[in-house]
């Protein structure tokens, strides 16, 4: 075989290797961008969402994020960084299917330190409306990441859920009901810890639950059957770290993983039936 024919042969082999197997369709991809704070970067939630999707039959979710610890959405709005962050390749060619917005855990209000009561979510509502407008101008769909109540004040979920669902309805934007799934797990399996010691941030199981809810909300597909272990980009207290070496983000028992997947799917389906 001469050099020219050998080169053509290798090119054909590479094309065939990259093509879908006969009878199979290439998987769809959803590009998802997360905006928020440590409730996103703890345990690398975007990486968990991506890792879960790789092992399921639905679309593959490719993710990126823009986060600052403790940030409110109004601060993401005022610092003006979001449009450039969404153009992560430095050009106007980057597009996103969904941009997920996560508010500070107390809905950007003052929490009563005795009762845990939250104030009016007016700042949250205004910021979401303004950010959603920016997101839609860039051709993406805004989605909302409903957070959970603090361990100390489980009744906070009533206000949190109402605020997210209210603004989601106003904007016709999907709401990932992570907080509601969190409450369901805490009620049914109080032995299955979702918090770290501060009673606010998620441990790996909590972030895994959030990832399952997010996957179900954005794809409309069940997360049941997702892997119990997920590897991805490592993270620290300041956010995801640049590294070529994947880290183990979560490792659950098969029973715990299956339970979290089932609750996530059940809660998302119940929410959509409202």
Where are these regions (language model features)?
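Short alpha-helical patches at coil-to-helix transitions and adjacent helical residues
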Residues: 42, 204-211
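Conserved catalytic region of serine esterases and O-acyltransferases that act on ester linkages
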Residues: 28, 201, 211-274
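Alpha-helical cap/lid subdomain in secreted, periplasmic
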Residues: 88-207, 216-225
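Conserved SGNH/GDSL esterase-like catalytic core that processes O-acyl groups on lipids
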Residues: 30-33, 39-123, 270
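N-terminal secretory signal peptides that target proteins for export/translocation
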Residues: 1-5
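Bacterial N-terminal signal peptides
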Residues: 7-18
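Short, surface-exposed connector motifs at secondary-structure boundaries
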Residues: 28-33, 140-142
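Boundary at the C-terminal end of the N-terminal hydrophobic targeting segment
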Residues: 21-23
């Amino acid at each position: 075989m001469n050099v020219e024919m050998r080169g053509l042969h290798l090119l054909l082999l590479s094309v065939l290797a990259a093509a879908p197997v006969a009878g199979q369709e290439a998987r769809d991809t959803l590009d998802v961008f997360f905006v928020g704070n440590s409730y996103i970067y703890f345990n690398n939630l975007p990486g968990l969402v991506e890792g879960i999707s790789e092992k399921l039959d639905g679309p593959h979710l490719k993710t990126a994020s823009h986060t600052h610890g403790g940030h409110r959405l109004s601060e993401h709005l005022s610092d003006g960084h979001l449009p450039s962050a969404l153009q992560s390749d430095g050009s106007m060619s980057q597009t996103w299917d969904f941009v997920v917005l996560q508010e500070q855990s107390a809905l950007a209000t003052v929490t009563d330190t005795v009762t845990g009561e939250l104030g009016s979510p007016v700042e949250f509502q205004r910021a979401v409306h303004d950010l959603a407008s920016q997101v839609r101008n860039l051709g993406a769909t805004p989605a909302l990441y409903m957070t959970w109540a603090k361990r100390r004040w489980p009744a906070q979920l009533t206000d949190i859920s109402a605020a997210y669902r209210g603004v989601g309805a106003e904007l016709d934007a999907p709401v990932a009901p992570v907080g509601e799934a969190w409450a369901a797990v805490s009620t049914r399996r109080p032995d299955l810890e979702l918090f770290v010691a501060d009673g606010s941030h998620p441990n790996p199981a909590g972030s895994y639950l959030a990832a399952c809810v997010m996957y179900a909300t954005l794809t409309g597909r069940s997360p049941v059957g997702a892997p119990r272990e997920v590897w991805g980009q490592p993270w620290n207290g300041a956010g995801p770290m640049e590294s070529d070496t994947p880290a183990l983000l979560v490792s659950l028992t098969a029973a715990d993983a299956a339970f979290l997947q089932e609750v996530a799917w059940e809660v998302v389906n119940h929410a959509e039936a409202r």
